[in-house]
Each structure stands twice: as C-alpha cells, then as structure tokens.
Curated annotation (Swiss-Prot):
Name under which the protein is recorded: CD40 ligand
GO biological process: B cell differentiation; B cell proliferation; CD40 signaling pathway; cell surface receptor signaling pathway; inflammatory response; integrin-mediated signaling pathway; isotype switching; negative regulation of apoptotic process
Chain's role: Cytokine that acts as a ligand to CD40/TNFRSF5. Costimulates T-cell proliferation and cytokine production. Its cross-linking on T-cells generates a costimulatory signal which enhances the production of IL4 and IL10 in conjunction with the TCR/CD3 ligation and CD28 costimulation. Induces the activation of NF-kappa-B. Induces the activation of kinases MAPK8 and PAK2 in T-cells. Mediates B-cell proliferation in the absence of co-stimulus as well as IgE production in the presence of IL4. Involved in immunoglobulin class switching.
A GO term from the CC aspect: Golgi apparatus
Keyword match Repressor: no
Species in which this protein is naturally found: Canis lupus familiaris (Dog)
Parts of the chain on the Cytoplasmic side: 1-22
Gene3D superfamilies with a match to the protein in the record: 2.60.120.40
Amino acid sequence: MIETYSQTAPRSVATGPPVSMKIFMYLLTVFLITQMIGSALFAVYLHRRLDKIEDERNLYEDFVFMKTLQKCNKGEGSLSLLNCEEIKSQFEAFLKEIMLNNEMKKEENIAMQKGDQDPRIAAHVISEASSNPASVLRWAPKGYYTISSNLVSLENGKQLAVKRQGLYYVYAQVTFCSNRAASSQAPFVASLCLHSPSGTERVLLRAASSRGSSKPCGQQSIHLGGVFELHPGASVFVNVTDPSQVSHGTGFTSFGLLKL
C-alpha cells in the first residue's frame, strides 16, 4: 500500500512598494514644495511690480497735470478759462497744504527742542539798607534785581526760592566796615544758609574776617560761593553777625544763584 503525503505551500512574504513608487512620491513632494516656493516668490514680485506701476501712473498723472498747468499759464491748448482756473485752484491748494505741513513740522521740532532744554534759571540781587538792620540781609526788589525765570523768586525781600530741583551755583559778596566802632571786637562772620522745604535751616558756607582798631571805615569784602543741590520749595539767604557794619553801596553787597 502506497501512502502519499501532501505538503502545505509556504506563506508568501509581504513585500513593500516597489522602488519606482518611492521615487515617484519623492519627486512629487519636491515638485509641490518647489511650486509653493515659486508661487510665493511670484506673488512678492507681482506685488512689487504693481506698486511700481502705481507709482509710475501717479508720476505720469502729475506730469500731465504740470504740463496742463504750464499750458494754462501760457494760454496754449484748447482748455477753457474755467478749466484753467480750476486747475490753478487745485495747484494753489496743493501748495498751501505743503507749506502748512512744513510749518507744523517746524513748530513740532521747536517744541521738542524747547522741551529737551532746561529753562535758564538765574537771579542776582543787591543789598538794601534798612532803618532796623537784621542779621538776615535784605535785598532790593529794584535796581540791579535780575530774575531770568519764574522758577526762582525773591521771597520777603530776604530769600531766593527755587521751584525746580537741580544743581545750583549759589554765591554772595558781603562788604563791611572793618574799622568802624562795633559792639564787640569779635570777627565779622557772613553765612550762606539753606531753608529746606521741611522747614529746617542749616549753614552751607561761612567766612569770617577780623576787625581793625582805627575809626575810619576800612572796607573789606567776604566772598562765598559753592554748588549745591536744591529741591523745589528750598530757599537760600545770607546771615551776618553785625548787620550795622554792612556796606550797601552799589556793587558792594550782592547775592545770587545760577542753575547749572
């Protein structure tokens, strides 16, 4: 007896897409990307070209307008008087608009320059004689009185007050009779003082000079000056130990400040 055996066929192995299909997909992808980039570049070029054409058209219209205006001035061409007057009025309105814009720009530049620059703040005053002299010297509101800005003022005839913070050069010159008989032989002392917005006072500068013994008046001068930071509402004044010895002649005793 003959026995037969049947063998099962082997399973077929799944294979991927052929190489030609892969190459086709790759080329298709490259083509699509290239087309997108080309379309974008063409759109940019077209946009710029349209802008250029628009500018050229505007220039051509301006050229035609100027030629027409020139013909109107010369009386050439077939334009009526009414059309020429209308063209001239348009041109005049255009010129007025340009001039107005230029004036506005100039005013804006001037305003910006003024805003960038700090206003000049300065003051110079001379002493004023008083029947009842006090240790804090008084200053004349007239004569050599100089105030260059409303940001500084003379208060109560004694103090120079500032309204803007900054560095100030403050100075004073006090002339006195060194040989005149005085209540004491103590040195003559002049002080430059600060009155702060909080109400406190302090000495900024101080100088002293000795007296002579002879009776005739021998004039001497004390000079004070320095740079200080002053705040809005602060004021400075001059104090002396013997106000009866101060000379109030023109140019002898003065006081002032200057914002740096």
